[in-house]
Amino acid sequence: MTEKNNSSSIEEKYQERTANLRKTKRISPFWLLPFIALCIGAILFFQIVKERGTSITITFTNGSGIVADKTQIRYQGLQIGIVKEVHFTDNLQKVEVVANINPEASSILRENTKFWLVQPNVSLAGISGLDSLVSGNYITLQPGDGDREDEFIAEEQGPIAQVSAGDLLIHLISDDLGSISIGASVYFKKLPVGKIYDYRINKNNKVEIDVVIDKAYAKFVKKDSRFWNISGINANISPSGLNLNVESLNAVVQGAVSFDSPADSPKADENSHFTLYTNLKAAKRGIEIKVTIPASSALIAGQTEVYSQDNAIGILAKLSAVENNDEILEGSLLIDPNQASLFKANSKIVLRNKKIDLGNLAEPKKFFRGEYFDVIAGDGETKHQFNVIKENELLLNAPNTLVLTLTAPENYGVSEGQNVFYNNMIIGQIVSQTIDVNGVQFKAAIASEYRNLIHENTQFVAATNFDISVGLDGLRFESATPEKWLQGGVRVLTKQGLGKAKDSYPLYQNISNAEHGITGNILTPTITLHTQTLPSIDKGSLVLYRQFEVGKILSIKPKTNNFDVDIYIYPAYQHLLTDKSRFWVESAAKIDVSPKGISIQATPLARSLKGAISFDNGGSGNNRTLYANESYAKSIGFVITLITDDATNLSKGMNLRYLGLDVGQIDSIQLDAKAKRITAKALINPNYMNIIAKEGANFTIISPQISAGGIDNLDSLLQPYIDIEIGNGNTKTQFNLAQTAPQRNKFSNGTPFILETRDAMNLSEGSPILYRGVEVGTVKKFELNSLGDRVLVHIAIMPKYSHLVRQNTEFWIASGYDFSLGWKGAVFNTGSVQQLLKGGISFSTPAEKEIQPQAQPNKRFLLQINRPEEVQTWGSGALSK
C-alpha cells in the first residue's frame, strides 16, 4: 500500500509539474561569410599596403617632363617606383613630386640619397639620356648613407660618373679648376681610363677634384703618379716662338686630365690625394741632361722644347748665365725617360730656330715652334752632359761640305740660319751674313751629298722674298712654294749643269730677275720712247719682241706736248735692239667681222688688262716714236687722202678692204671748213700701196642696208668698212669717198640698161632682175626724166647673162603674185617671199623667126606693169652669145 501511495504521490507530483522544453540557440552558418570576407579584405589590404611600398616626396626646381602615373623612378636601369602626384609648393617656386618606391628598394632611401631627372641632352660635351627618348623622362637616384628619409631635394644634374665596386676614387688638388667640368675624361697614355666625378673648395681654399678610375685601369695609378691638365688649347707666345698645344675635341670642349706613373712605384690607395699640374711641363717628369748652350735671348726655361726626329721628348728645365762669359749659358733638360737611349757619347744636341712655316698649317704644333733643341742620336756610352752647337756649325763641321759666297745689293729677306733649297728639298744652309758698302755677302754651306748639283751656270734666288705687285691685272705675287713664303731661304736653279762650281754667285731677288739676268735692285732705262697720246699702257707693262717678253716699262713721264716712256730691256735680250727698231702698242684683241662670223684673237689676260709694247727691226732710221698699233707703225709714210661730203658712217680706225683683205685703216678725220667737206687720212700697208694708190681707184663706204626685202652687206653689220676697186692709172694719193649704198659685188661690173615706167610701184634699189625665175641682175637706182612724167629704172645684168637681153626683149614687174580670171578659170601664180617684200623685174624675148641682135649697154626698154599673155610661148629656142 505504501508503495502504491508513493507511486501515486509521484504521479501527482509530476502531473502537477508539466515539463517545458527549451531549444538551445546556435550561430547560423550564414554569418561565416562576412567574417571570411573581412579576413580576405584584411589580407588584401595588408598586401596592397606592402606592394605599394614607401611614399616619398621629392622637390624639383621645375616639373618639366614629369607626369603623374607615368614618370618612372629607376635605379641601375630597373623601375623601382613611379610618380603618383605632381603639384606646386606653397610659394609656387618649386614642384613637389609624390612617388611610391617598391618595398624591395626602400632600403636605399637614406638621408644622403640623391635624386635627379634624366632627359635627353645634346651638347658639345656629348649626348646623354638617349634611353629617355623612347620611354620618356625618368627619375634616377644614387644611394647614400645616413638615417632613413622620405623627403628629398632633387639635384639639378646628376653625377656623370658613379663609383662602382672595384673603381678607384682619388682626389686631385689644384689652385683653380681651369676648364675642367664634371664628366671630363682622365687619360693614361692617350687612353680614357676614368671620369671627373665632382669638385669642391676644401678647407685650405684649394680646388679638390674627385676622380673615378675604372676598375680595369685602377692598377695604373701609383703613389708617385703625376696628373696634369690637358684641357682646351694651350698657347704661349715668347721670343722662342709660339708654343701651341691642341688636344682632342672632347678635351677642348669639356676639359681633360692626363697622368703618368713610374713602373716601379706601388699602387695608389683609395681616396689618395695628388697635385694637379697645369701642364706636362709643370709636372717636370723626366731624366735630367746638363747642357752648355750658345747665348740666345729666345730660350725660356719651362717653355723651350727638346725634339728628336720631329717628336717632342723633353723641355728646357733650367737656364742660368755663366759668370764672366756672355757667349754661353748653362742649363738642364728634362727628357722623357723612354728616350734615354738617345743620349750617347757621339750624340749631338743642336740649337735650331723653327721660324713661321706656312707649310705646317696642317700640323698646328709645328706652325709656331720657335727656337728648340734637336737631338741627333749617336753611338757610344750613355752620357748626361753635352755642349749644344748651333745649326750652322753642324753643317760647316761636316766633311766635304761645299762653301759658297752669294752677293746681292740687299739681303732680300735672307738671313743667317735659313736653308738652301733645290726642288723644295733642303740641301744646305746660310751660315753667315756680312754687310759692307757694296752690298750684302752670304756664306752658304751645301751638304756634301748635294754638291754635285752646283755648277758654273747655277743660279741662286731669294726664296724668302715675297714680291707683291698690284696693278690692272690684280694682285700678283712671286715667291717660292707657300711653305717658303715665311720660312725663307735661298732657292737653287740648275739648268744643264755646265762647268764646275764657282766660289761666288750673285743672289737674285726673284725668278724673273734670274731668268733675265737682273742682278741689281735699281733699273735704269735702256731706251726712251715718245708718244703724242697716252695709250693703254702703264708702269710695269711688258715689252715684247715677236710676242716674247724681253723687257718692261719703267715709267711714263708727261711732257708739254707728248709723253716719255722709259723702257728697260733685259740684259739677255738687249742685242735685239737696233737703230731700225720700231715700237707700237700691242692691241688687247684683234677682231675680224665677216660673213663667216666673228673672229676674236685675244692676247693673254695680263697683257689685255695692263697693256704691252711690241717692236721689230723693220723700220728705217733711229725712230723712237711709240705708235698706237702695229698698222700705224708699219704704215708710216704710206698715206692716202679720202674726201667725202658726209662722215656719218666714217670713223677713226675703220678698215680699208680690197677683195676682202684688210689693206689699211683710217688714221684721222678732219673737217675742211673752207671747202665744206670731210678729209680722212688712211694708212696703207706698204705691201699694197703700189696696188691701191692708182688713178681710177674707187673707194666706197660699206654699211648694212636694211629693207623689207632683207639685209644687204651683212658683213658690215658690226663693223662698217671701206671697199676698194683698184684703178689702172698713174700713182695717186687723193681720192673721193663714195657714200652711195653699194651693190653686191657680183653686179658691180654688170651691163647697164634703162627701163622706163610710169610708176616705180613696189620696186626698190637692189630688187632682183629675173630670167625664168633665176636672178641675173639687180636694180641699181631710180631717177625721173627731165619732164618728170616717167621713172627711169637703171638696172645691171651680170656679164655672163647680158646676151639674154635682145633688141626686142620685154620687161615687166614681177610683184611676186599674179591672179587672172577668165572663161578657162582662175589662175594664181606666186613668186618668192623676197619678191613679195622687195619686188622684182622679169624679162623674156618674144619668139620670132630671126633672133634679134643683142641689146647695147644703156639701151632703153619699156617696163610693163603686167606680164604679157604670150610669154609662155617665148624663148623656146636657145640664144647664142
Swiss-Prot record:
InterPro entries, A to Z: Mce/MlaD (IPR003399), PqiA-PqiB_transport (IPR051800)
GO BP term (any one): membrane organization
Spans traversing the lipid bilayer: 30-49
Pfam families: MlaD (PF02470)
Topology within the bilayer: Single-pass membrane protein
Zinc found in the keyword field: no
Localization of this protein: Cell inner membrane
Alphabetical keyword list: Cell inner membrane, Cell membrane, Membrane, Transmembrane, Transmembrane helix
Cellular-component GO terms for this entry: plasma membrane
Family: Belongs to the PqiB family.
PANTHER family, per database record: INTERMEMBRANE TRANSPORT PROTEIN PQIB-RELATED, INTERMEMBRANE TRANSPORT PROTEIN YEBT
Protein name, per record: Probable intermembrane transport protein HI_1672
Organism in which the protein naturally occurs: Haemophilus influenzae (strain ATCC 51907 / DSM 11121 / KW20 / Rd)
